[in-house]
Amino acid sequence: MSQVDINHARALVYQLLSSLFAREVDEQRLKELTSEAAQQFWEQLSLEANFTQSVDKIRSTLNGIKDDEALLELAADYCGLFLVGTKHSASPYASLYLSGEDEPLLFGEQHQQMSEFLHQSKLQVQSHFPEPADHLAVMLAYMAHLCCHSEDSVQLSFLQTCVDSWLAKFINQLTQCDKNGFYSAVATLTLAWVKQDIAQLEPA
């Protein structure tokens, strides 16, 4: 497999993880995530020991959705965890975990930093996703872009500074709130993937 192929595969994983944080799983997305191709992808990903437990939870949840009610319950989990903004939720914004302030503000320093990164790459947050730029979904989508368009050193710096720096705190908050465990598994997989990617990108 060439380096181009490897980077493309890495980008696909980041895009997948980004999509799961960007919006709830609807009927069309469920079909995609449980298709034969997706099952092969999950199977391949689960072969890595650090990913196995999280991938198994994600697969069992998705494959276990057999009716609209179960799909709505997963959508309710997404809403309750990421959209409500209470102490019983885990808002996926870097600024809430990296700011030293007692009452960190949305659209703060991390948002401004991400907005500048996007601007430099001639990218922007899509209009149908009205969220601050330091939303985890935006950061993972940007990393997918970097995989195919930037030097390893740029990718490494972004992962260490902007993603890995707060993911563990986010997961700690998320696991306290996530009764069903699906999104905790997605977040834990994300952190494990980021850690592995950092190790691969670091110079020998």
Curated annotation (Swiss-Prot):
Cited Gene3D superfamilies: 1.20.120.1820, HscB, C-terminal domain
Any GO BP annotation: protein folding
Subcellular location(s) per record: Cytoplasm
A Pfam entry, by short name: Nitrate_red_del
Protein origin, superkingdom: Bacteria
GO cellular component: cytoplasm
Record keywords, A-Z: Chaperone, Cytoplasm
Disulfide bond annotation, renumbered to this chain: none
Principal location: cytoplasm
SUPFAM superfamilies: TorD-like
Family listed: Belongs to the TorD/DmsD family. TorD subfamily.
Functional summary from the UniProt entry: Involved in the biogenesis of TorA. Acts on TorA before the insertion of the molybdenum cofactor and, as a result, probably favors a conformation of the apoenzyme that is competent for acquiring the cofactor.
NCBIfam families, sorted: PRK04976.1
The protein, known as: Chaperone protein TorD
Organism: Shewanella baltica (strain OS223)
Lineage start: Bacteria, Pseudomonadati, Pseudomonadota, Gammaproteobacteria, Alteromonadales
